[in-house]
Amino acid sequence: MSYPQEVDKRRTFAIISHPDAGKTTITEKVLLYGNAIQTAGSVKGKGSQAHAKSDWMEMEKQRGISITTSVMQFPYNDCLVNLLDTPGHEDFSEDTYRTLTAVDSCLMVIDAAKGVEDRTIKLMEVTRLRDTPILTFMNKLDRDIRDPMELLDEVESVLKIHCAPITWPIGCGKLFKGVYHLYKDETYLYQSGQGSTIQEVRIIKGLDNPQLDAAVGADLAQQLREELELVQGASNEFDQELFIGGELTPVFFGTALGNFGVNHFLDGLTQWAPKPQARKADTRIVESAEEKFTGFVFKIQANMDPKHRDRVAFMRVVSGKYEKGMKLKHVRIGKDVVISDALTFMAGDRTHAEQAYAGDIIGLHNHGTIQIGDTFTQGEDLKFTGIPNFAPELFRRIRLRDPLKQKQLLKGLVQLSEEGAVQVFRPLANNDLIVGAVGVLQFDVVVARLKTEYNVEAVYENVNVATARWVECADEKKFEEFKRKNEQNLALDGGDNLTYIAPTMVNLNLSQERYPDVTFFKTREH
């Protein structure tokens, strides 16, 4: 197959949802339809507690939330699909944000009993920044749901995106009978398939087919016809251009738990979602059809293999083809490296990649030299942009139970901060270590991982820090004066960038007024 054909068949997407809308279940079922795992949700761990194949860190298994982004590749129709799983828990916005910079489309999962929830709103704001195309799956139709028309109205008014229903539900809860496909004029009858059983679906052609009345009952069939008249009059038709521009979302109904409807949106994804897209770099735009290799690191994951203390850098291939043993330029440090052991991911199973194309995600073994946002090329000096670091909103001082382990603590914290799990600040005025996070859960994750991965027992104490800003100043003399007078409030972050840690917002505002030549940044490009 030629290079352009390989690129054209790639689809790289992420699933976004509010916690508990059923994202992990959908991830499993998607893999099931892609034949990537045999028994969804029953991948047995030690002991017999079952856990999904994509939730693979210890704490995730205990809490049932996906904390780290996993990558899964599977074939579907004539495409090769890369699914990036994003943390569903509300705390992990940074990691999720960075993952969304590496995909070309998203599937938004909505719990049809609840409708649009706040986390969904936040994630949609992020996809807006790059006008990412969105597909929507209304999940949990085997339960009692809200009125489907109401759900569409809510998505349109709250998320400011037009809805084009592709399938329409027939009943819900105990009366859920299936869905009607508006563009194929077919009804798919629902039979619950649990676990890894994908039921043969009975298809009834045509809306006026008497078999439909016989199968779902005359009342529901009549209700369906009336609803569809309303839907076709009141809602948008699917429009490929508006979808690609992020202005319209095709909507599918189903139940992931009952293995029903998942294949409908996968058909939509492979048919309509964009192939790997061009990306902005600091000097030019890089097209996916270019034959020279380029890629950027959007995430670093420590200790994916508990047996080896390794760290893997996840890289999105933007253009060209990776081949085992090729020489690439690590642009930030200006060094050429030979990459012979890149990984690909089949749902948590790591295999060595012989090759990878634009749109694929590969894993690079990282011994501390790779950072989030790093660009790799075949020699060209360019840096992909748009992978931000956010100023944390919560701070704690971290302290050791055993003071002799200071070195391990620092090493662990720096590694975790490079990975983007947390940010670490070392004040210039004392030997404290301050940890900054976007959400409370991140603090628990750090202590748990320090213990299991670095054998360090640490505890938190409150610290008088309200917020942090990265500081820069073009005037060297004024900057020196600023540093001299504010040493008490200055720290270095994990990447040795100078940071102002403010005890109160008032203090920050006063400092900004007092030093107009110093710029205080809330986000920083990686």
Swiss-Prot record:
Keyword entries, A-Z: Cytoplasm, GTP-binding, Nucleotide-binding, Protein biosynthesis
Family, per entry: Belongs to the TRAFAC class translation factor GTPase superfamily. Classic translation factor GTPase family. PrfC subfamily.
All residue ranges annotated as the tr-type G domain in the record: 8-277
Main location: cytoplasm
PROSITE patterns with a match to the protein in the record: G_TR_1, G_TR_2
Gene Ontology molecular function: any one: GTP binding
Source superkingdom: Bacteria
Chain residues that bind GTP: 17-24, 85-89, 139-142
NCBIfam families associated with the record: prfC, PRK00741.1, small_GTP
Gene Ontology CC: cytosol
Organism: Actinobacillus succinogenes (strain ATCC 55618 / DSM 22257 / CCUG 43843 / 130Z)
Pfam families named in the record: EF-G_D2 (PF22042), GTP_EFTU (PF00009), RF3_C (PF16658)
Stated name of the protein: Peptide chain release factor 3
